Amino acid sequence: MSAGSITRRGAHSWRLKYEGGEPDPTGKRKTRYVTFRGTKREAQVELTRLLDEVRAGTSVEPSKLTIADYLRGWLGSDPDLAPKTLERYRQLAEQQIIPHLGGIALQKLRPAQVHDWLGVLLKGGGKGGRPLSARTVGHARRVLHRGLERALRLEIISRNVARAVPAPKVNATEVDILSAEQIGDVLHKLNGNPLYPIVVFALGTGMRRGEICGLAWGAVDLDKALVRVERSMEETAAGLRFKPPKTRAGRRSVSLPPNVVDVLRAHRRDQMAQRLLLGLGRAGTDDLVFPLADASPYPPDKLSRDWGNVVRSRSLPKVSFHALRHTHASALIAAGLDVVSVSKRIGHASPAVTLTIYAHLFQSKDDMAAAAIEAAMRPRR
């Protein structure tokens, strides 16, 4: 079988040529042409995928390609998607998209079908026919939309019908935040627990769970009270891996409050004693700040489970581990920091993201500011 070829058509357009489909009586396959928009490397990856389908006998004529076959082919291995994202996309495709739209020919999908599908998910797309949240339905629509955009680039379809159907509106909900009194109670009840230094660190920095699990001592400067966020730990079905921050804003330096520095110094001493017992010697710059007791990496999902267990066993406020990040952000806002500064410290892609999540907190500060202005302008007697 021919290895196929790639010919440039424009600045970012390529024609992929390969032999595909069922062979005729002479054993010859029909020559296929596919237009691809993107970089040459991406075009080469796509050609390799198409040839692999032909070899595996799973190649289908574009007009006969169903949504199920297309999504499974795309999500079989997309080099542009992070492993965790790919895992989540596959889950959404298999659970929310394919059971409802999978049998429809990709080229025959219409906006009305997408609209009806979203309604079905909202009413009973969950396990046992339970309703799905608008947020989850929106995630499923995003997977379909992204898949159709790719099919459009490949000229398998002439338009992306998902563009005509907006995602269901997600009602704004206030995030879980610990009050000052609750913070004190949590730290008091956790004192002496292995999670204590992690919780203090999370509250004091607002770092994400994966960033905390992936933090190495080489990125911590206790003398300068500074931490460099350079990577995150990601957990997928294939195991653990370190990955760079999602956006440029995610790579940042975070200053440490004095009490967090003190807790980290004590934690490092305790960790050193534990390493000596294990015969591991002094912790190096590549060693993790918050590993498991045997010095192995602390999986982010396990951290969440351990937090949930200690919440129940010690009667702590019923909030997720991520709520510690929200609590940190709320403290910054309450202290009067502007949205740009808050966004920079917690590593959001843009201040707009920060405003979307914490709009109600900024509004309360604005109300206080308005009241202060009114008081200042009140006539003196």
Give each language-model segment a name.
Residues 126-130, 185-196, 205, 254, ...:
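Short, basic (Lys/Arg/His-rich) helix/loop patches that form interaction surfaces
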Residues 2, 188, 224, 233-260, ...:
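C-terminal secondary-structure termini that scaffold catalytic or DNA-interacting sites
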